[in-house]
């Protein structure tokens, strides 16, 4: 925040999964001293409120920055259907609803971590979101070797009907 203030930079925080935090309290950059003036958060209704595909979100920050975003948005599109906006407002107002969704994802992830660990993967519970990436296996029984995550992913889908998303950009992960 101090760096952004010194250099007149606006921090744009991707907070799409802000309600999907596990094992610790959620911390908003806007709650930190100077955060409201130095940052804006981008929120999505998709996963946190089970509104995937509805293409609805909101921004939070200082009145100056939010007004600037609203001005751009007013000139870029015609908004979202009113019923969808009302559904989003109801979701935000009902804190129990987003907590149920968060608990649902947490249960799923804990189960997946347990199963993957049992199968020999180095899986651990993430601190947030609903994704789980694990190091890709280097090979399979019988001496089959995988050069990268893509090879491991193709083997898993073709031989075991297990669908994964390979990620080789920062190491081999599934």
Please name every model-derived segment.
Residues 1-174:
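PLP-dependent class I/II
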